[in-house]
Amino acid sequence: MDPQSPEAIEKQKQFFERARRSVLQHLSDQGGKLNMSELHDFSMKKFLIQHQRFSIMMEGFVNEGLVEFDWGTQDATLTDAGRQFLAKPA
């Protein structure tokens, strides 16, 4: 399959969305607060998401209000909006 085909692009989007949900669920399962390095390790081991895509994912979480990020401690905290997102069916 051509990686630029509409089908391939759609599969990539679906994969990334599954990864996003899984990373948020992992954050929730760990008490709702984790250091960014722990989230990065999880996403890399489970989904092979490297640094740049992980950064895009985290920026999306913060911009959507699903996660708050503390630059001083490098901790990500799941918000109420993040919990509501996880409560919705995938």
Over which residues does each language-model region extend?
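Short alpha-helical segments that sit at the start of domains
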Residues: 1-26
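Short amphipathic alpha-helical elements of helix-turn-helix/winged-helix folds
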Residues: 22-30, 42, 85
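Short acidic, hydrophobic short linear motifs in intrinsically disordered regions
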Residues: 33-43
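A composition-biased, non-transmembrane "mature-region" signal
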Residues: 35-36, 56-58, 73
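Short amphipathic alpha-helical interaction segments
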Residues: 48-63
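A short, conserved structural fragment
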Residues: 62-72
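Minor-groove-contacting beta-hairpin "wing" of winged helix-turn-helix DNA-binding domains
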Residues: 74-80
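Short, amphipathic alpha-helical interaction segments positioned at domain boundaries
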Residues: 83-90
